[in-house]
């Protein structure tokens, strides 16, 4: 059953999911889980190592397994990996169980934010060498072209480019609370209609 208070945060790497997620959970009075951290804990290794040693297919299986642990919960904010929605099974599970929130950022802003993080696979080419800023921007644009259609299925979208984090969290809190109230009202109307039949 769909739980509007099960919040899935999505967005490209560098959009602010790991920073905003715990603050949003605190603002809503919910728990917080970073799915990538849970996968690393389960596997006993970093996501980079999982990809390198066991391949993407194994990582996607782990992703689904960990996601399923949280899909029946409520009052929970789950930070998703930037590419998770490309996993069809994960995408279907998310759409059917909770509320998807998209943290949108301009590709140039993402490139600037990510250029300071050397541990991200996105920052490296196939040869393992660090990419130039232009190459990072192009890589982001190419990946967004693939990911954006699923990001845009989110019930709630917030821009994270220029706002302060606190302002973004306040805006998200208002939008989520409003969305949950609308969902509850629709459910109440459906229940009332069914009882009358």
UniProtKB/Swiss-Prot annotation:
Entry binding sites for substrate: 36, 60, 82, 147
Instruction: Tell me the domain of life.
Output: Bacteria
A GO molecular-function descriptor = ATP binding
> Which GO BP terms sit in this record?
amino acid biosynthetic process; aromatic amino acid family biosynthetic process; chorismate biosynthetic process
Residues recorded as binding ATP, renumbered to this chain, are 14-19, 120
Where does it localize?
Cytoplasm
Record PROSITE patterns: SHIKIMATE_KINASE (PS01128)
Pathway it belongs to? Metabolic intermediate biosynthesis; chorismate biosynthesis; chorismate from D-erythrose 4-phosphate and phosphoenolpyruvate: step 5/7
Record key words, sorted: Amino-acid biosynthesis, Aromatic amino acid biosynthesis, ATP-binding, Cytoplasm, Kinase, Magnesium, Metal-binding, Nucleotide-binding, Transferase
The coenzyme or cofactor needed here is: Mg(2+)
Q: Which GO terms describe its cellular component?
A: cytosol
Q: Where does Mg(2+) bind?
A: 18
Q: What is its EC number?
A: 2.7.1.71
Q: Kind of enzyme, top EC level?
A: transferase
Cofactor detail note: Binds 1 Mg(2+) ion per subunit.
What catalytic activity does the UniProt entry give for this protein? Answer: shikimate + ATP = 3-phosphoshikimate + ADP + H(+)
Entry-linked InterPro entries: P-loop_NTPase (IPR027417), Shikimate/glucono_kinase (IPR031322), Shikimate_kinase/TSH1 (IPR000623), Shikimate_kinase_CS (IPR023000)
Coiled coil where? none
How does this polypeptide assemble, per the annotation?
Answer: Monomer.
General function of this protein: Catalyzes the specific phosphorylation of the 3-hydroxyl group of shikimic acid using ATP as a cosubstrate.
Protein family? Belongs to the shikimate kinase family.
Q: Which PANTHER family match?
A: SHIKIMATE KINASE, SHIKIMATE KINASE 1, CHLOROPLASTIC
Instruction: Quote the protein name from its UniProt record.
Output: Shikimate kinase
What gene name is listed for this protein? aroK
